[in-house]
Amino acid sequence: MHNLSLFEPGRGNVSCGGPFLGCPNESNPAPLPLPQPLAVAVPVVYGVICAVGLAGNSAVLYVLLRTPRMKTVTNVFILNLAIADELFTLVLPINIADFLLRRWPFGEVMCKLIVAVDQYNTFSSLYFLAVMSADRYLVVLATAESRRVSGRTYGAARAVSLAVWALVTLVVLPFAVFARLDEEQGRRQCVLVFPQPEAFWWRASRLYTLVLGFAIPVSTICALYITLLCRLRAIQLDSHAKALDRAKKRVTLLVVAILAVCLLCWTPYHLSTIVALTTDLPQTPLVIGISYFITSLSYANSCLNPFLYAFLDDSFRRSLRQLVSCRTA
């Protein structure tokens, strides 16, 4: 369902916003039938992502909420990332049902809710990663200068997280407003129904997502890390700062790894948006297959972060083992 993957390839409504590289014009009479291998592979891949994501993010939430020593500033942001991923994987079965049934059976309220959750997933990851990058900027710079970051507390991190959720809610609200049920080729679909001219509004929605969901947060993150590297080059670390730097290196590595995986999963989708805005690709089986691959890659981001925590965070591994052993004892 990515950036409304509730929409089908090749459908006639020019408000198409799904994961597809091209947008069909209004004269297309019917959607192209999916190749049989793709019709089988897509729900299987979505199902695996859903199962792995639910299990992994549930484990992350369990550890972070039940272990007192895991209540750190960085983990507040990781907790919110896990909540966003968990919400998305919880509604992914509805996407799978929509794909298999080829129609929307869940009503308009659920349509608006699923569209909103989908958009939360699109925007929240990079927004929280921008906040985590800003936090790393302050911590690493303060470490290099042998000082503490004033006001960096667990409570402050929670307040910032609430502010991020409020901002994301404002950003995704237009999608929920435009989402509604519409009859297309005799089937009821959950789609974005834009005012006239639809083509203009469709392009505006894709540009809106590209700028607010990718260009601004990624530019902010890049600016933070470039500025940090330039500042560090000008600072001579003393022995105390070097010791602190080594102690905090794993946390910084974890944040950078989460960011790298997020960009790997989301960049192809946003590049496809540029293609959709600048070209008029036909809805061929190849284009549809590439589009579903891009969608699946963006979905996969919701199940990969727990593996990063398990491999890169010793505290997370220890806490998870202790909680599991306590439950089985």
From Swiss-Prot:
Leader sequence segment: none
Residue ranges, Extracellular side: 1-39, 100-114, 180-204, 276-285
InterPro entries reported for this sequence: GPCR_Rhodpsn, GPCR_Rhodpsn_7TM, Neuropept_B/W_rcpt
Disulfide partners: 111-190
GO-annotated cellular components: neuron projection; plasma membrane
Positions glycosylated per UniProt: 3, 13, 25
Cytoplasmic side: 64-74, 135-159, 227-250, 301-329
GO MF annotations in UniProt: G protein-coupled receptor activity; neuropeptide binding; neuropeptide receptor activity
Keywords, alphabetical: Cell membrane, Disulfide bond, G-protein coupled receptor, Glycoprotein, Membrane, Receptor, Transducer, Transmembrane, Transmembrane helix
Taxonomic superkingdom: Eukaryota
Compartments in which it is found: Cell membrane
Gene3D superfamilies: Rhodopsin 7-helix transmembrane proteins
One record GO biological process: neuropeptide signaling pathway
Role summary: Interacts specifically with a number of opioid ligands. Receptor for neuropeptides B and W, which may be involved in neuroendocrine system regulation, food intake and the organization of other signals.
Name of the protein this chain belongs to: Neuropeptides B/W receptor type 1
Originating species: Rattus norvegicus
